[in-house]
Structures are given as structure tokens and as C-alpha cells.
Design a protein with these regions (language model features):
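Long, domain-scale functional regions
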Residues: 1-325
Length: 325
């Protein structure tokens, strides 16, 4: 395995590992020279590497062990270059989270939302049969145009969204890095507030609205409420704080997941057939849930195969992790 070190005079240079070629930018001279050195480095699996960072400072955050090895804080060094764009690492999780026996898998989330998409065009909160699950695991996963797929809606079935994923979807060179996993669909009644730890248990429980699935399998999902809850800096926002009360600078303001507006989570209400827990633009989890047919920001979440390894980067925005399989 090789790591490229690029030094240029008269411009900035970087090695494109996907294309295995040099990219030159920010040219300031007519005479540009670049020196490229290739270094043989040992294979470091990404999951093991992140676990080794436990309790170490990472940007304005750190890695903690709370129902998984997770990044917390306002802007930790958890950037990863995946699918030719920025994603961010939620953490490393065992089979309790993803169902792949004996494996620690890295869970990542797209840095930006795709679009405002209905969680389910039929306004029911069963993820296993939802339009968004079909869209993300179909057209998005296969980098196809899903606009006319029957699943691409910004609101109910009355507003078609932009679901052309030929370029924004998962490209062929990256699909093999994604693990097919179990997504837990346990719900919560929302009659009382809940902390991150409580939500983590509800998500993996079996309390659901009558007829809804308690789990399903697939490549692409969404974040859980607990993923958001654990993303805040615990020294600023105590873990005993319920997620309904996160709309403050000390809680939402110290979370790297906050700041993308209204967003869907994967977790449904168990009180009725149509509410799903969502992240409000003020930074709290909506305790009443939102109607599944509404168009909210949707950020794909996936687990990387355990064989994915790190070849470069420190996780910062300007030097994201570069991975291979």
C-alpha cells in the first residue's frame, strides 16, 4: 500500500487516489514543478484506527465510548472523503447496532443533505416499506435517476423532488465498501422526554406501532436520534439532558451534526402510524414527531465494510481520511 507525498512550487498539488494521478490547482507561476514521493505504509484498518483515538482530542471534539466509539463536539476531525465528496464519521459500532456478527463497523453520514424528501409518501411510519428507504437503497445506491421511480417526493405524492442521483449517488467504485446491515426500527411513545441513552435502547427495542417492522436490512439508512444526542460535547451538555431540550448553545451549539435545518431520523413514534422523530432547525429532537409525508432534509447513513482501511489524512476538513478496501 502506498501513500503519496506531493510538494509543488508555483501551485498547490494533491494526489487523487481515486484516479491515481496528480491534481494541480491555485497556480501562481508559469513555471510549476512538483515532486511526488510514494511511501510504502502498513495497512491500518479504519475501525481499529478510530478506536485507538479513544479520549484523544480531535479538532474541537474527541472520541468517546458511549454505546459505541463516537465523535462528539462542535467540529471534531471526523471528515472522510467518500464517494468523491465529504462524509463524516459517526463512530465505530459492534453487532448490537448493525447485526454483523463479530465485526466493528465504521458508520458514516453524508456531510450535506440530499434534498427535502418525504420519509414516506403514504404518510405511514414503517421504514421497511417507506418510499425513502426504497429511494436510498435503489436509485441513490445505484447512482441512477430516481425522479420517476415512484419514490421521489418532496411532500406526500403531490410534489416530485429532484432525485437524479447519476452523479450524486453512490458511484460504482465505492459500493463494494458498503456493508449490508440490520437497521433497528424500534419506536418510542414520546409521552415523556428521553436522553441519548434512553433513545439508544428504544431504537433497538421492539415497541412499534401495530404492524410495523422492528428491523430491516439494507445498505443505506438515516441517523438515529441517539446519534445526534451523543454528538454533543458532553462537558458542555450533560448526557442526562433530554433531547427535547437541546435547543441551546451548550447543546446543539456543541454538536457537529447540527446545522443542516430540519432533518429526518430513522426512528418512528410507536404511538401512531404516521409520526417520525425529526431534528428541528433550532437543534432539538421534535418530541411529537413529524408527519412522514413532509419533505425534510435527508442525509444518507451507511456502514463501511470491516476491511476498509485508511491510507491518508487526519480527519480534518483540509485533510480528510482517504480510504480503500
Amino acid at each position: 500500500m502506498y501513500k503519496a507525498q506531493v510538494t509543488c512550487a508555483g501551485a498547490d498539488g494533491r494526489w487523487l487516489y481515486d484516479d491515481w494521478k496528480l491534481a494541480i490547482e491555485n497556480i501562481t507561476s508559469d513555471d510549476v514543478t512538483c515532486d511526488i514521493k510514494f511511501e510504502t505504509i502498513p495497512k491500518t484498518y479504519l475501525n481499529d484506527y478510530i478506536i485507538s483515538l479513544l479520549e484523544s482530542e480531535q479538532g474541537t471534539g474527541k472520541v468517546v465510548n458511549e454505546n459505541g466509539y463516537r465523535y462528539e463536539g462542535k467540529n471534531p476531525n471526523n471528515y472522510i472523503w467518500f464517494n468523491n465528496e465529504y462524509w463524516r464519521i459517526i463512530g465505530v459500532f459492534d453487532s448490537v447496532s448493525h447485526g454483523v456478527s463479530g465485526k466493528n463497523l465504521v458508520k458514516i453520514i453524508r456531510a450535506e443533505t440530499l434534498d427535502g424528501l418525504a420519509w414516506n409518501k403514504s404518510d405511514t411510519n414503517n421504514w421497511k416499506t417507506s418510499s425513502l428507504k426504497s429511494l436510498l437503497n435503489g436509485a441513490y445506491y445505484n447512482a441512477q435517476d430516481g425522479t420517476s421511480s415512484g419514490y421521489c417526493y418532496g411532500y406526500s405524492t403531490t410534489e416530485t423532488a429532484n432525485c437524479d442521483y447519476t452523479k450524486r449517488g453512490i458511484q460504482s467504485g465505492y459500493r463494494g465498501m458498503i456493508a449490508s446491515v440490520t437497521w433497528h426500527l424500534g419506536g418510542y411513545s414520546s409521552t415523556t422526554s428521553a436522553t441519548s441513552s434512553a433513545f439508544y435502547g428504544y431504537e433497538r427495542g421492539t415497541t412499534v406501532y401495530s404492524g410495523n417492522a422492528t428491523s430491516t436490512t439494507g445498505y443505506i439508512g438515516l441517523m438515529y436520534p441517539s446519534d445526534y444526542g451523543y454528538s454533543v460535547l458532553s462537558s458542555s451538555c450533560a448526557r442526562k439532558t433530554d433531547l427535547w431540550s437541546y435547543s441551546s448553545g451548550t447543546c446543539a451549539g456543541q454538536s457537529w451534526l447540527y446545522g443542516k435545518g430540519y432533518e429526518w431520523t430513522l426512528t418512528p413514534s410507536s404511538s401512531d402510524s404516521y409520526h417520525v422523530f425529526s431534528l428541528d432547525d433550532e437543534g432539538y429532537v421534535n418530541g411529537n414527531g413529524s408527519s412522514a409525508s413532509i419533505g425534510y432534509g435527508s442525509r444518507p447513513v451507511l456502514y463501511l465494510d470491516a476491511s476498509v482501511y485508511k491510507i491518508d489524512g487526519d480527519g480534518s476538513l483540509n485533510n480528510p481520511y482517504i480510504v480503500r478496501m
